[in-house]
């Protein structure tokens, strides 16, 4: 149930854990903390509490900043977190509390499972039942060297590849406000990235009606905006030996693991070729100033949500032996799932055939669903 005063576990699946953070319980003062770790991990936390003001009011706030490159290749993180709490004792019978918490973040992902031999051939060959031929010089997998600028080995991540910094096409992602920005790093591009911000806001009211009757009411809003990225369309890809899937070769004929070729994709999408080839497929496209058709793009799979609710509970102590509790739990929610264009990868538009309402395809631009 999040930050609420309700102590009922149902209908929360698995029950409820509720951590009470009372601003009035903290003395005046603050602190600053820094943490460091492997993979360029750096986290800074600053906190300040006002303590009790005029014997009836208190505020508390915490801000966190976290960055890192990641131990596995290009699994970087870029995140903030915040907490704000306020408490006001209006009189002996009425107390109000306001809480807000959230953590906007982005991070590079490592989603695709690889054969053990792609990480450590020697260890794979030592595993009982593993076919050592798979990691021989002519075998199916490589755990050393590189292809297309992506190194193989234990920290290999198939979800990224280098890209020329001369490509300055913007990316679109929405996280409480439209954002059309440069990619995370000018020298590489993540195929899979997660970005999300889910703020929670609670307004709590505690009313003492009498010595044996108490009413608590919580108004809350739970948001959510973000998603995850991936490819859409045809993406030039090379095998572990650097052989590109083109007019007479499919990349998965060769050894693994496989590597995306973003620079070839940008060249295809921004070039003047009537037909380009990806994995032996001929892809016809239009081209010209402001009219370059992309054959492959990056997409966002978005999740946007809003939940509003009221939780109210009345406690009535009839006697030491009998205590009654009445309450309501009401909420309404709206959730949107869709795909949108994240990066046109050098082109001006993409023709999407996923919508049955457009038999000849629908032209979509940056940020379009």
Sequence positions of predicted segments:
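Short loop/turn motifs that connect adjacent beta-strands in outer-membrane beta-barrel proteins
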Residues: 8, 24-29, 53-56, 92-93, ...
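Face-selective signature of the C-terminal outer-membrane beta-barrel domain
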Residues: 197-227, 233, 238-369
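Outer-membrane beta-barrel pore domains and translocons
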Residues: 2, 20, 33-39, 62-66, ...
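N-terminal periplasmic accessory domains that precede
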Residues: 9-33, 44-50
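Outer-membrane beta-barrel proteins
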Residues: 35-43, 66-91, 105-111, 121-122, 173-206, ...
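Transmembrane beta-barrel wall of Gram-negative outer-membrane proteins
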Residues: 29, 36-67, 72-110, 117-163, ...
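Surface-exposed loop/interface segments of Gram-negative outer-membrane beta-barrel transport/assembly proteins
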Residues: 104-184, 263-293, 355-369
């Amino acid at each position: 149930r999040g930050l609420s005063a309700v102590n009922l576990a149902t209908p929360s699946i698995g029950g409820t854990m509720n951590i009470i953070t009372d601003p009035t319980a903290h003395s005046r003062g603050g602190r600053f903390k820094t943490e460091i770790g492997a993979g360029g991990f750096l986290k800074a936390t600053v906190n300040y509490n006002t303590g009790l003001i005029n014997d009836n009011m208190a505020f508390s706030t915490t801000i966190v900043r976290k960055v890192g490159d990641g131990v596995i290749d290009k699994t970087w993180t870029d995140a903030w977190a915040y907490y704000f709490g306020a408490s006001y004792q209006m009189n002996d019978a009425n107390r109000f509390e306001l809480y807000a918490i959230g953590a906007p973040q982005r991070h590079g992902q490592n989603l695709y499972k690889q054969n053990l031999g792609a990480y450590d051939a020697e260890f794979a060959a030592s595993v009982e039942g593993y076919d050592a031929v798979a990691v021989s010089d002519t075998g199916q997998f490589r755990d050393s060297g590189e292809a297309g600028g992506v190194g193989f080995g234990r920290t290999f991540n198939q979800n990224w590849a280098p890209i020329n910094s001369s490509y300055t096409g913007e990316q679109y992602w929405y996280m409480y406000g439209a954002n059309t920005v440069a990619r995370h790093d000018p020298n590489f591009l993540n195929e899979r990235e997660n970005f999300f911000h889910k703020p929670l806001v609670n307004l709590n009211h505690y009313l003492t009606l009498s010595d044996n009757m108490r009413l608590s009411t919580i108004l809350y809003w739970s948001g959510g905006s973000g998603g995850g990225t991936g490819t859409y369309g045809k993406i030039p890809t090379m095998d572990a030996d650097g052989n590109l899937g083109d007019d007479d070769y499919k990349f998965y004929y060769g050894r693994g693991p496989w590597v995306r070729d973003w620079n070839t994709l940008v060249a295809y999408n921004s070039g003047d070729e009537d037909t380009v080839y990806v994995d032996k497929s001929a892809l016809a496209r239009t081209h010209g100033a402001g009219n370059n058709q992309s054959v492959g793009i990056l997409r966002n799979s978005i999740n946007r949500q809003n939940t509003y609710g009221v939780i109210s509970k009345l406690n009535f102590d009839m006697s030491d032996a009998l205590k009654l509790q009445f309450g309501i739990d009401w909420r309404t929610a709206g959730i949107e799932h869709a795909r949108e264009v994240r990066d046109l990868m050098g082109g001006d538009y993409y023709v999407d055939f996923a919508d049955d309402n457009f038999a000849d395809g629908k032209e979509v631009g940056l940020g379009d669903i």
